[in-house]
Amino acid sequence: DIAIMLEWDDQTKSSNFDHSALYIDRAAVMFPVTAEKEAPSITMGEPGKPVNIWQWKAIGGERGQPGVKDNSNIKLAYQTIEDLNAEGYSTLTDQNQQDVKGGAVWKNNKWRLVFTRSLTNSNANDVQFKKSIYSLEILCNFIL
């Protein structure tokens, strides 16, 4: 498996259910679906060069509508991790198969987020982290 942790300062926890809010807390990482020497555009890939985007939102989004009773025992309530694809700006698409797991915690004015997934799988729309293609150095540089 692969795990990616992101941590950032955030003085305000923006995680309410106002779907009209443009500035909710969220983060994403993006990977090329196919291994090519020339990386796809950083603006969500480009036609013929798809990207796999792992996105987290502090609210439930369309999959977790408001109205669910609060459960103080759950630390990751109302959060979504989405496994997405794009081939350029305005082409963001949900995958039918959601392979990425994870969650985030906001504490002491910081978010700490973890994405996890198997290194490889059978989904042609997912990045495949094969040792012969990716090195740790390349992967870390791409994510940062």
Describe these PLM feature segments.
Residues 1, 9-10, 103-107, 123-126:
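Acidic, contiguous internal or C-terminal segments within carbohydrate-active enzymes
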Residues 1-74, 131-143:
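Surface-exposed, glycine/proline- and aromatic-rich loop segments on solvent-exposed faces
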Residues 13-18, 87-91, 124-127:
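Intrinsically disordered, low-complexity boundary segments flanking structured domains
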Residues 22, 93-97, 108, 131:
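A generic structural signal for short, non-catalytic loop/turn and secondary-structure boundary residues
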Residues 23-27, 100, 109-111:
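Residues that flank catalytic or metal-binding motifs in active/ligand-binding sites
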Residues 31, 91-94, 121, 129-131:
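Generic structural "secondary-structure junction" signal
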Residues 61-105:
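Short helix-loop boundary/capping segments
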Residues 107-144:
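Ser/Thr/Pro-rich, low-complexity mucin-like regions
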